[in-house]
């Protein structure tokens, strides 16, 4: 299954707030969940919705998500927590968290178009796994810096997680450590994703 490129508001209406997918929010009067789906939720449906939330928020394919679950399952710590740490340490997600991109798909595009450097080297793979003490910068050319400058200006500096720091004048971000569970910007029960 390929990456989702369809209407984003449909997914938000169905699954709830997904800040990584888009900044838009549905109208408060149009609550389609209650209209179509009343009654008892089955366990399978609950687990499927949690998995879909994770997939659409981080912009993953089904195969990528299964690979991350497999890697997290081999770890000795809690599988759900390791899964979220793996997903949060992706380069496209870190750019989104730093405020260098408005959404995760926007961050993917920045990385794919070779505007981003990690430790002084161009990285064009959005799923690149960042480590603590990685320095993320933009290229020195004007076009790359203007793209990031617009996003930084419109982002909220109070929402920056504790495991990241940003220098807005030099367009430079730093990964301090691996994040804690409480700083994940998505309301999700990761254990249901692992069970699915």
UniProtKB/Swiss-Prot annotation:
Subcellular location, principal: plastid
Keywords recorded for this protein, A-Z: Chloroplast, Plastid, Ribonucleoprotein, Ribosomal protein, RNA-binding, rRNA-binding
SMART domains: Ribosomal_S4 (SM01390), S4 (SM00363)
Compartment(s) of residence: Plastid, Chloroplast
Superkingdom assignment: Eukaryota
Keyword Flavoprotein carried by entry: no
Region (Disordered): 16-36
SUPFAM superfamilies named among the record's database cross-references: Alpha-L RNA-binding motif (SSF55174)
One GO term (biological process): translation
GO molecular function: rRNA binding; structural constituent of ribosome
Protein family: Belongs to the universal ribosomal protein uS4 family.
HAMAP family: Ribosomal_uS4_B
Function: One of the primary rRNA binding proteins, it binds directly to 16S rRNA where it nucleates assembly of the body of the 30S subunit.
Name this polypeptide is given: Small ribosomal subunit protein uS4c
